[in-house]
């Protein structure tokens, strides 16, 4: 399997070690929408790659991760807005479940993650 390329993650493989680096140092590696999805894709690649035996997760720059990107969080209300309150809450619930699934990809990964 070839090493994937991402916009918010730097991924490279050295032997049996896959190094996945959060790569938004100008934003203290805050998790934006693209990074959430790329984290899931990167750890699915690690899990499926027969040549990877362990994954190393790190952050570029002086901070590992600042948490959720506040700009993304501010847009959640617009993203989930609906005139029907119940539908709005359901959209929000589905978004939260999707974000949780992205981070759960580390737990689902059959290879050790450091």
Predicted regions and their residues:
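Short amphipathic alpha-helical segments
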Residues: 33, 69-70
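Conserved CoA-thioester-binding segment of acyl-CoA-metabolizing enzymes
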Residues: 1-60, 86, 90, 97, ...
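Short, active-site-adjacent cap segments at secondary-structure transitions
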Residues: 61-66
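An acidic, glycine-rich surface segment that forms the CoA-thioester-binding/catalytic face
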Residues: 40, 44, 70-114
